[in-house]
Amino acid sequence: MARINQLVRKPRRARAKKSDVPALEGCPQRRGVCTRVYTTTPKKPNSALRKVARVRITNGAEVTAYIGGEGHNLQEHSVVLIRGGRVKDLPGVRYHIVRGSLDTAGVSGRRRGRSKYGEKKPKE
């Protein structure tokens, strides 16, 4: 245990928190190019074909990003915007692709939660 005088001279240092999204390097989003678009299966007990893309970000990092929503228009060489946020049942997927920006189309026909899927308000 440190004495009071030692703590006055040299205070305790808080441990630096490890980033959940290191490839973004502190940025809220990053642009990247799809190198591979494919489906993968989640871990137990879930079962599906989850749409993911391998993306090379502008800083040179290569990450796996999830494509949310029903249907997408992404293919190899599509330019996408990446944000943080992991997918719990897909190991190694720590990023999401932002729908409705750059080459990524929004989810057409989406009525609820449209802002998360890049869809404009429908005309009445």
UniProtKB/Swiss-Prot annotation:
One of its GO terms (biological process) is translation. GO terms for cellular component: ribosome; small ribosomal subunit. Keywords: Ribonucleoprotein, Ribosomal protein, RNA-binding, rRNA-binding, tRNA-binding. This is Small ribosomal subunit protein uS12. One of its GO terms (molecular function) is rRNA binding. Belongs to the universal ribosomal protein uS12 family. It comes from Coxiella burnetii (strain RSA 493 / Nine Mile phase I). InterPro entries: NA-bd_OB-fold, Ribosomal_uS12, Ribosomal_uS12_bac. With S4 and S5 plays an important role in translational accuracy. Interacts with and stabilizes bases of the 16S rRNA that are involved in tRNA selection in the A site and with the mRNA backbone. Located at the interface of the 30S and 50S subunits, it traverses the body of the 30S subunit contacting proteins on the other side and probably holding the rRNA structure together. The combined cluster of proteins S8, S12 and S17 appears to hold together the shoulder and platform of the 30S subunit. PROSITE patterns: RIBOSOMAL_S12. SUPFAM superfamilies: Nucleic acid-binding proteins. NCBIfam families: rpsL_bact. The keyword Nucleotidyltransferase does not apply. The lineage of its organism: Bacteria, Pseudomonadati, Pseudomonadota, Gammaproteobacteria, Legionellales. The keyword Cytoplasm does not apply. Part of the 30S ribosomal subunit. Contacts proteins S8 and S17. May interact with IF1 in the 30S initiation complex. It holds the Pfam family Ribosom_S12_S23. Residues 1-25, 103-124 are annotated as: Disordered.
